[in-house]
Every structure is written in C-alpha cells, then in structure tokens.
C-alpha cells in the first residue's frame, strides 16, 4: 500500500490551542477596554452564551465559520454597549484583527516542524481544521500543499466534507490517504467514516480505546507510523 496524502488537524495536534486562545482573547479585551469600556461588564458568561445562540440562530450560514461568528458576536455586543451599527461593525472588525494576529502566534509542540519537513518530502500534506488558524501566518505553508477549514466547506469535522474535499484536491482515493489528529471523534472517527486511514496523536497517554490504525504519543513517531502503514 502506498500513502500519497497525509492530512493534519492543527489545534491540539501541532500546538496547544487553549493557551493560544486565552492569550488572544486577553489581548483583544485589552484593546477593546479603552475604546468600549462597557464591553467587559457586558460580556458575562450568561450574556456570551445567549449572544452566541442568538447570532447563530439569526445567521445559520456562519455556524461553521468561527471567524465570522466571533465578529458578529462582538458587533452585537458593541451595539448593546451603545455603539451605532456601523461603528459597532467597524470596531468588531478592528478587534478581530487583534484577535486573529494573536490566534496565529503559536508555540509548536516538540518536533512538529521537523516532522512536517520530513513528511512533506515523501507525501502531499494538507491541513484540515474546524478553527481559523492560518498555515501561512503560523509559518507552515511551506509544508502543506493546501489547507481546508470548516468555513471553506460549510461543515465541521467529523462530517465528511473536509476529508472528501482534501482527497478530491489531491486526486487520491481513501486507501492512499491518512489523517492525523488528536480528537477521537472529529479526527479519527471522521476519517474512518470516509475510508481513510487514521493516526491518533495521544500526547497525554489516555487509555481510551480509539479505533485508529495507529497511535503516537509524540509527533516525530509519525514518520515511522506512516511507514508501517505502508508496509502493512
């Protein structure tokens, strides 16, 4: 068996996303505070949940577009804080520019770039993400032939659209493709459902029984794991 395409999840597979998001939100709030002082007190946990639900109900098309969702939530919050719609929209987009800059400021897991470099010399690589990280802005565009987000296909993993689109672009069948990711459902089950091979990245040594073709506990081990799949 020959593997021709290796697709990668990004968040929590190549870097720890919770740290990234917390810092991005902190920097965004720091930017907003002197410009819209009422924002911090308005954005309670209850209001955020209500705002998210309302925005998604009114804009079902952005359910899988986390960037558009965040912008619209900030716009609505700014309106609730007293800004006119046009001003709220402009401020939301400015605030999002701050957020996304920090969203794409990441620290890679050990061995991530070296592993991608090695694999990109052997296979076509693609990034598949439910989030809004940008492979060019994080400095991985030299390794990936292309990247697909949930916003691009209007559907999030584990739904099949992203996996199928990747194989279509790479012109490969499922038996020549493998997906790498940390999430047992979004990544592993999603890939399995479309017939792709799957490798579970289990950094924490979880004991869950995940139906992946292989499991690794560090990224450098992917090179050998994929080679073993080819030999099977």
Predicted features by range, described:
Residues 2-110:
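N-terminal helical cap/lid subdomain that shapes the substrate entry/recognition surface
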Residues 1-6, 17-18, 34, 41, ...:
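Asp-based, Mg2+/Mn2+-dependent phosphohydrolase catalytic module
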